[in-house]
């Protein structure tokens, strides 16, 4: 970011000027999207095709708004393949290793010429064959490097058998030259592999590594862009020389987690003069603020949940544009591919349990502790009577035949998570427990939500945040139970 701040305006590319708001993004007109594409994936729906056409036609920046379950990554795979048909070179990034590996796994069956940057220990086993580290050992160019390595090893072994000092000195000299040759050939091998790859994938941070120095790309694609800090997104932009940026994400889910004490403080953007900018303001957010729907297309069909579960987030957050696919709109727990009894829980998609008036009072975890005593959970909140109700409902699901590994219990508070863990972890082996924030991006057949808050002041705290409620309501396929 220091480099970016010091860069004079005269050096800004067209894309940079658009991202800073110094120039307006060129609006895509219907005629720009008139080209009929030869779709490689016949399963795409109309909104996915529209988003791909829009991204291809956009000259500088395009946002693909993909709510959970709408096939955002599925859409990106087709977009990448369409870009390759146009002979474009792509740098594909995400804020985490798992977000990048997910794309690599989806691209792999299509024999895309790609390389994944990153340490092998941090990558999923299924993507290792595409990692730069493995390719440098298995490619044709790697064979020459291996030959030099073998020769070095042989020279090292011969030293131990040589007693003559002059001969040992000569061998050391040969090894020194071999090491120099080895480093040069290894660097050439690595550089060649990256240079010849039409698709390079890395985390946003990893895109700033030396492997991409002097490499040029036509397009940067960032998946999970609404989970990435804006500063992270500038790393591939500055290293790639790309003229187009495609961001995919959902700004109506939780933003990246910021632990800085002044993260909420509002500052003015030094480049654009815009106010209301803080660390939680993502590049996706800022582009929407600058250009609105002119740079965005939304995926409108979700393939995850029953239409009744879909109703609240669609109406409250997605302008009633989000619809359930025919294949899932009436799907219930009783329809699972194993034997499940028909009960009140397995024949309904949404169940609310009202604990009002039942003395289900919340408590702060340090209420009963001296202020000087440190608490493992800080000042998080819990509600033990509500946790007991949750246990009862989980038991009813299991008794009906739902497998524990298909059930998740989520709660917004770590204090309640600790209480639930004590009650459920050993009794229901395989059940998944997590915070609402931590469970984002995952899904289960049935989710029980423990909301915790119950007080005379009717305060709900950060549960008033719509994006947090959205994350809570979009993790389940067949049933959600809220306590």
Per-range role (PLM):
Residues 86, 96, 205-483:
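Conserved helicase motor core of SF1/SF2 NTP-dependent helicases
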Residues 1-41, 139-148, 168:
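Intrinsically disordered, low-complexity accessory regions that flank the conserved helicase/ATPase core
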Residues 172, 180-181, 482-483:
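Ser/Thr/Gly-rich flexible loops in soluble cytosolic domains mediating phosphotransfer, phosphorylation
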Residues 2-6, 104, 310, 421:
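A short local structural element in Rossmann-fold oxidoreductases
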Residues 21, 25-136, 177-184, 189-318, ...:
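ASCE P-loop NTPase helicase motor core
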């Amino acid at each position: 970011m220091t480099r970016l701040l010091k860069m004079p305006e005269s050096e800004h590319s067209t894309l940079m000027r658009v991202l800073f708001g110094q120039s307006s993004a060129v609006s895509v007109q219907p005629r720009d999207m008139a080209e009929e594409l030869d779709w490689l994936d016949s399963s795409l729906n109309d909104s996915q095709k529209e988003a791909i056409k829009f991204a291809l036609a956009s000259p500088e920046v395009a946002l693909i708004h993909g709510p959970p379950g709408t096939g955002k990554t599925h859409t990106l795979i087709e977009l990448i393949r369409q870009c390759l048909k146009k002979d474009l070179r792509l740098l594909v990034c995400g804020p985490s290793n798992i977000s990048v590996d997910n794309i690599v796994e989806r691209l792999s069956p299509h024999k895309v010429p790609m390389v994944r940057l990153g340490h092998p220990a941090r990558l999923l086993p299924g993507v290792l064959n595409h990692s730069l580290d493995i390719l440098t050992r298995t490619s044709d160019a790697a064979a020459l490097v291996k030959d030099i390595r073998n020769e070095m090893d042989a020279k090292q072994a011969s030293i131990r058998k040589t007693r003559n000092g002059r001969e040992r000195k000569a061998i050391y000299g040969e090894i020194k030259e071999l090491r120099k040759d080895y480093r040069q050939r290894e660097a050439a091998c690595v550089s060649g592999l990256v240079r010849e790859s039409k698709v390079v994938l890395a985390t946003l941070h990893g895109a700033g590594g030396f492997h991409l120095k002097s490499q040029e790309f036509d397009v940067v694609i960032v998946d999970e862009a609404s989970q990435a800090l804006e500063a992270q997104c500038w790393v591939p932009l500055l290293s790639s020389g790309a003229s187009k940026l495609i961001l995919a994400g959902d700004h109506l889910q939780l933003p990246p987690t910021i632990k800085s004490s002044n993260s909420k403080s509002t500052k003015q953007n030094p480049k654009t003069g815009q106010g209301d900018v803080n660390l939680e303001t993502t590049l996706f957010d800022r582009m929407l603020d600058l250009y609105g729907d002119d740079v965005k297309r939304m995926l409108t069909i979700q393939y995850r949940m029953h239409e009744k579960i879909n109703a609240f987030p669609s109406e409250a957050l997605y302008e009633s544009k989000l619809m359930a696919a025919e294949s899932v709109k009436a799907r219930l727990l009783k329809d699972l591919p194993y034997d499940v009894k028909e009960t009140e829980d397995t024949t309904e998609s949404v169940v609310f349990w009202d604990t009002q008036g039942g003395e289900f009072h919340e408590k702060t975890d340090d209420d009963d502790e001296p202020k000087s005593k440190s608490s493992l959970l800080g000042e998080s909140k819990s509600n033990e009577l509500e946790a007991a109700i949750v246990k009862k409902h989980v038991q009813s699901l299991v008794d009906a035949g739902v497998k524990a590994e298909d059930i998740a219990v989520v709660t917004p508070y770590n204090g309640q998570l600790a209480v639930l863990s004590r009650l459920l972890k050993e009794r229901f082996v395989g059940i998944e427990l997590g915070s609402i924030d931590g469970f984002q991006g995952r899904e289960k057949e049935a989710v029980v939500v423990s909301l915790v808050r119950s007080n005379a002041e009717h305060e709900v705290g950060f549960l008033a945040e719509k994006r947090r409620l959205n994350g809570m309501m979009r993790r389940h396929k067949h049933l959600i139970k809220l306590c």
